[in-house]
């Protein structure tokens, strides 16, 4: 119902996500002020869902802000970038010291840091808050990753923890850290999501090529996998999508969808950030590039015509063994993707002084979000037991799972390579694993080459300091 009472929190921007967050808050007993640039959406929300709780509609931004109790908390749910800045600029003159602006959109964490600094100087709190779970999650319980000050979380926390997904009685929400921490963690979440989906797609492609199976038959394999270590939301819906039949043609749904995967940019942001921090997130990077490559249709067609028979004929002799090999390779590659993602979060936390709880991050990803999976409990346990874990791969559970999967992993990548089936995420994850465990890498040669053409110096294994060799002259070595 509509009410003239003071609202505990407000939502401006009532497209699907904003509308569902407002409804979720109202359903959980909070009085919610609602506003949209076009008042028709505000009226529509109250008319259609007013019986779910108490809404206070605001025709104008001034009316909307005036209806909020102090300190005011305003959730902004508009497109990232300039539209978000425009709404903030409209809000600021209407707010008072101590009020809170919450950006629940997919903002770049650097923009969030800029906005937080600017608004803090004006006496306002700014919480960049990641929300994962899509439309259904926003309504029924998402994973929520709030950043910003501890003071802002004191106001927001009780509300966000109430509307978030719950797993084992624990809300999938925690105060991630100051300024851009919440949006940074959400960005990395999305990067892991890219890798997870690419790995699943490659597993499907391998099963289809190796078994000559139909999508419906492969759906049953994924359903079986979802009963074990791979249990996750994405594996569950993969089975649903593969089993779906197109009503218009009677064909498998995946066979009538164009094979061009789109992206909104968070995968690219994740890769760019990792490059800035010097963190090798190879699986996430390959997943992002795979989407880019899928869109280069003209190049793909030209290559297909030029190299029609570049792969060997593939014939699987033992179906069950092959399916198990793909399952183990998928699990090992997935572990690598999560390990890289958590390495990235730790590096960002150190660089920006955020002090992010890695075990806590795994905890709030267990429900509501797109990458929710059974083994997030294991990730939480690993970081709770050893917060300074050098890499998730060496935690006992994950080390055992990866070790058990290595022979299958190698067979799958080798078979795919011979058959000409592209597995960029599987292959790069295996290469990352091998590079990480290698006693010595060929990077020594690279350093020698850099010193040869650019006098970039090198360090020796037998003494301290940097050195340079005069390659063009007498090749003597001297301290740099």
Question: What residue ranges belong to the model's regions?
Answer:
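C-terminal amphipathic alpha-helical interaction region
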Residues: 403, 408-480
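Small-residue-rich helix-loop
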Residues: 349-383
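Interdomain hinge/lid region at the active-site interface
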Residues: 183, 208, 213, 220, ...
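Glycine-rich, highly charged phosphate/nucleotide-binding loops
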Residues: 56-63, 80-88
